[in-house]
Swiss-Prot record:
Pfam families: ThiC-associated, ThiC_Rad_SAM
Residues binding [4Fe-4S] cluster: 579, 582, 587
EC number: 4.1.99.17
The organism's place on the tree of life at top rank: Bacteria
Subunit relationships: Homodimer.
Protein name: Phosphomethylpyrimidine synthase
EC category name: lyase
Record key words, sorted: 4Fe-4S, Iron, Iron-sulfur, Lyase, Metal-binding, S-adenosyl-L-methionine, Thiamine biosynthesis, Zinc
GO terms for cellular component: cytosol
Naturally occurring in which organism (per UniProt): Cupriavidus necator (strain ATCC 17699 / DSM 428 / KCTC 22496 / NCIMB 10442 / H16 / Stanier 337)
């Protein structure tokens, strides 16, 4: 498949979105909550009719979870320079526990805002940021623990259920909603769509088993949940580097990622104009945005880890919190005493954040300042409702290093920090590996659930083998499906370029689709209510040779259509009862249909006679020769 060129400007990107973003045979619909401004998006995939001897039978539309935001709504005009609608602004203002600041609190933020050299790069439609009023806590966990159901929680309940309970009484959906029993492996999943209530969401947030990453300054956000008892989510990474790229390219990567199904995005920029790049992404993102603040703090030192200070890092946290970043990866578990444990590893410390903090600890022979200042970090987090993504700085970089003392020592420290964050009512998820062979994955999940008190687990794969450079989206997708079933709440995607180079748009697409497959497989295995609906619809379309429906119900309709058309490009092939794999004479599904038609055409007497012979055969012991 040809690779698409990146957008040259915001104007060309907007034009491209208007022309190419729409999904085939789909409509954008909304579920309305208890108030008119709770409008939860979902995508409905339209199906063609089934042709029978008795005429055409309608096939119902299939609702699917949608991460694409307003970009897939034909009624919304996209203006990247103005940003997306502020869907949460009224909810936040009505709570009365925040205040609009007179200006930016971060020294670095003020410097960037007043620097004439970056004026042409800045997002022009900025408003002053909000912060909690003195003594207030504005986290979703704090509200949940006070018994308050926020609009964000109600939004999540509708989004997770897709209102599937309304379909169970409709005859058209009866067969499509059949589902194999799952094995939730001890998780407390809702049994039916109607069990996914706002109160259920509140309880999960209050317990710490789930988070709603939703900074009060990211008003464009469409709320979503990350937790063991919800749908498995996936994260996509983007970010510029010293050798790439433009602001428009990074916004394009974000939009491209959510088009294919990324539930959250991490901006891992390490190149020029990190601050401005992040602002453009946030103002145009309907999904939560995460960052690794130590990257930008290191950039401020000129790349010298030893020169990092708590004061510099604190200013970076505030700068990013006031922009609207929803979760921070913070490597507070990389303790001085753990660093020597990595000495005998094959690949040492492979986390960028982990290596930065390890180098700082060794250079100063002091404890990690992220650990010693953790309570102060919590004060910042709860003032803006930024969630922790506690980083696994000592994750294994190869399967030989998996499950060692350094990895699990850090994990136990992350559990200690989770308990500390929860005392502040700050939301937490835990980052996990990495590279782990299949037989050692369950131990990772068990350790996390035990020592981190069921806080959501967020893993990078894991890759289950190290022998396939160029195919690590597959080696990691195998591990991701397994650990997702075992209880991981969010899977960080891996692209084919992992370990080899910076991914382009097509690599991002490949990684996201791979991880959508893994997450969906995990939902099926867990028994998420309604998870099998799309599988059943596609299987029925496949058996009935409804080729267009097969394409459109898939995760990547364009890829499926292009593969089919490579050998059978004619339009007539879209209604043919065969494909190029078996041809017209050897198609098993076509033969099965012919057998069914033949059986249905037999007189009742003939059918009865065959049934009698069948019974006689069984009574004789099912022996062909006596």
């Amino acid at each position: 498949m040809a690779r698409t060129a990146p957008a040259a400007s915001f104007e060309s990107l907007e034009s491209d979105l208007d022309q190419k973003f729409a999904y085939p045979a789909s409509s954008k619909t909304y579920l309305t909550g208890s108030r008119p401004d709770i409008r939860v998006p979902l995508r409905t995939i339209l199906q063609t009719s089934t042709r029978t001897d008795k005429g055409e039978m309608q096939n119902p539309p299939i609702p699917v979870y949608d991460t694409s935001g307003p970009y897939s709504d034909p009624d919304v005009h996209i203006d990247l320079k103005a940003g997306l609608p502020a869907v949460r602004a009224k909810w936040i203002e009505e709570r009365g526990d925040t205040e609009v600041l007179p200006g930016l609190s971060s020294e670095y933020g003020r410097d960037r805002a007043n620097d004439p050299a970056t004026a042409h790069l800045r997002f022009a439609q900025l408003t002053n940021p909000r912060r909690a009023k003195a003594g207030a806590n504005v986290s979703q966990m704090h509200y949940a623990r006070k018994g308050i159901i926020t609009p964000e929680m109600e939004y999540v309940a509708l989004r997770e259920s897709l209102n599937l309970q309304a379909l169970y009484d409709k005859p058209d959906y009866k067969a499509l909603l059949r589902q194999h029993p799952g094995n939730a492996l001890g998780a407390g999943l809702p049994l039916r769509p109607e069990d996914i209530t706002p109160e259920f969401v509140r309880q999960e947030i209050a317990s710490g088993r789930a988070i709603i990453p939703a900074n009060i300054n990211h008003t464009e956000l469409e709320p979503m949940a990350i937790g063991r008892n919800f749908r498995v989510k996936i994260n996509g990474n983007l970010g510029n580097s010293a050798v790439t790229s433009s602001l428009a390219e990074e916004v394009e990567k974000m939009v491209w990622s959510i088009r294919w199904g990324a539930d959250t995005i991490m901006d891992l920029s390490t190149g020029k104009h990190i601050h401005e790049t992040r602002e453009w992404i946030l103002r145009n993102s309907p999904v939560p945005i995460g960052t690794v603040p130590i990257y930008q703090a290191l950039d401020k030192t000129g790349g010298i880890a030893e020169d990092l200070t708590w004061e510099m890092f604190r200013d970076t946290l505030i700068e990013q919190a006031e922009q609207g970043v929803d979760y921070f990866t913070i490597h507070a578990g990389v303790l001085l005493r753990y660093v020597p444990l990595t000495a005998d590893r094959v690949t040492g410390i492979v986390s960028r954040g982990g290596s930065i903090m390890a180098k700082w600890c060794l250079a100063h022979h002091k404890e990690n300042f992220l650990y010693t200042h953790f309570d102060e970090i919590c004060e910042i987090m709860k003032a803006y409702d930024v969630s922790f993504s506690l980083g696994d700085g000592l994750r294994p970089g190869c399967i030989a290093d998996s499950n060692d003392d350094a990895q699990f020592g850090e994990l136990r420290t992350l559990g200690e920090l989770t308990a500390k964050a929860w005392k502040h009512d700050v939301q937490v998820m835990i980052e996990g590996p990495g590279h782990v062979p299949l037989q050692r994955i369950q131990a990772n999940m068990d350790e996390e659930l035990k020592h981190c008190y069921e806080a959501p687990f967020y893993t990078l794969g894991p890759l289950v083998t190290d022998i396939a450079p160029g195919y690590d989206h597959i080696t990691s997708g195998i591990g991701a499906a397994n650990i997702g079933w075992m209880g991981t709440a969010m899977l960080c995607y891996v692209t084919p370029k992992e370990h080899l180079g910076l991914p382009d748009k097509e690599d991002v697409r490949e990684g996201i689709i791979t991880y959508k497959i893994a997450a969906h497989a995990a939902d099926l295995a867990k028994g998420w209510p309604g998870a099998q609906l799309r599988d059943n619809a596609l299987s029925k379309a496949r058996f009935e040779f409804r080729w267009e429906d097969q394409f459109n119900l898939g995760l990547d309709p364009e890829r499926a259509r292009s593969y089919h058309d490579a050998t059978l490009p004619a339009e007539g092939a879209k209604i043919a009862h065969f494909c190029s794999m078996c041809g017209p004479k050897f198609c098993s599904m076509k033969i099965t249909q012919e057998v069914r038609d033949y059986a249905a055409s037999l007189p009742k007497e003939a059918q009865q006679g065959m049934e009698e012979k069948s019974i006689e055969f069984l009574k004789k012991g099912s022996k062909i020769y006596s």
